[in-house]
Amino acid sequence: MEPQEERETQVAAWLKKIFGDHPIPQYEVNPRTTEILHHLSERNRVRDRDVYLVIEDLKQKASEYESEAKYLQDLLMESVNFSPANLSSTGSRYLNALVDSAVALETKDTSLASFIPAVNDLTSDLFRTKSKSEEIKIELEKLEKNLTATLVLEKCLQEDVKKAELHLSTERAKVDNRRQNMDFLKAKSEEFRFGIKAAEEQLSARGMDASLSHQSLVALSEKLARLKQQTIPLKKKLESYLDLMPNPSLAQVKIEEAKRELDSIEAELTRRVDMMEL
């Protein structure tokens, strides 16, 4: 028989033994459940064996105690003609209490020499238990404080998480809005670029001078701006010349020439812009 089938058979026999006449609950038979139930059956078997050994040992000790008690009873009867049956009700209660105490303290007999060490050991165990109980109590108080602090921290963290989620949601909305605006601007930029290109192609087909193109006009505008910047120090220099007494007519002529050159450039730029608008 295969090991798996053998385990299933052992498990089935164990379950039948456990439940007896009662129906066995349904369960899925697979290697995993079989392994778990087989492990439980083995542990149950070991436990039953240990319990059986303990019971047998207790039976043997009980038999020994009964024999010893009978021997002591016979000895008392022979020596002092004493029997538990001859005791009063109070004496019987005292005797039973003495026996119960000996059993509870696990002494070998009811002598004072056995009771005193047993009571001392029990007292020591009591003090150790109290000390351990105090340690556990202190530890529990620490755990309660730590738990309270942890709960407060958890609440703060939850609030921080909520705030972070709200901030993240707001920022995400802003990013989405910016992305939409950027896409719109890109689309418009492409639209304008194609529109400018189409207009330039139309103007070129109509015989427009290439110097009137958008790029040329931009370059010309930049050149004009540079020239204006260059004329600023010249104007300042000429203004200083105007303050000089010698030969003011010549300085005035130079100024007029510079003005005419600047007006000519501005007129040319205006003309080209006007032609572009047509």
From Swiss-Prot:
Q: Which residues form a coiled coil?
A: 49-79, 124-177, 249-277
Main subcellular localization, coarse class? cytoplasm
Might you name a Gene Ontology BP term for this protein? centrosome cycle
Listed A to Z, the keywords are: Cell cycle, Cell division, Coiled coil, Cytoplasm, Cytoskeleton, Microtubule, Mitosis
Compartments where located? Cytoplasm; Cytoplasm, Cytoskeleton, Microtubule organizing center, Centrosome; Cytoplasm, Cytoskeleton, Spindle; Cytoplasm, Cytoskeleton, Spindle pole
Taxonomic superkingdom: Eukaryota
| Family matches, as InterPro entries | HAUS1 (IPR026243)
What GO cellular-component annotations does this UniProt entry give? centrosome; cytosol; HAUS complex; mitotic spindle microtubule; spindle pole
Could you give the subunit structure recorded for this chain?
A: Component of the HAUS augmin-like complex. The complex interacts with the gamma-tubulin ring complex and this interaction is required for spindle assembly. Associates with microtubules. The interaction with microtubules is strong during mitosis, while it is weak or absent during interphase. It is unclear whether this interaction is direct or indirect. Interacts with EML3 (phosphorylated at 'Thr-881').
Function recorded in the entry: Contributes to mitotic spindle assembly, maintenance of centrosome integrity and completion of cytokinesis as part of the HAUS augmin-like complex.
Report the sequence similarity comment from the record: Belongs to the HAUS1 family.
The identity of this protein, by name, is: HAUS augmin-like complex subunit 1
Native organism is Homo sapiens
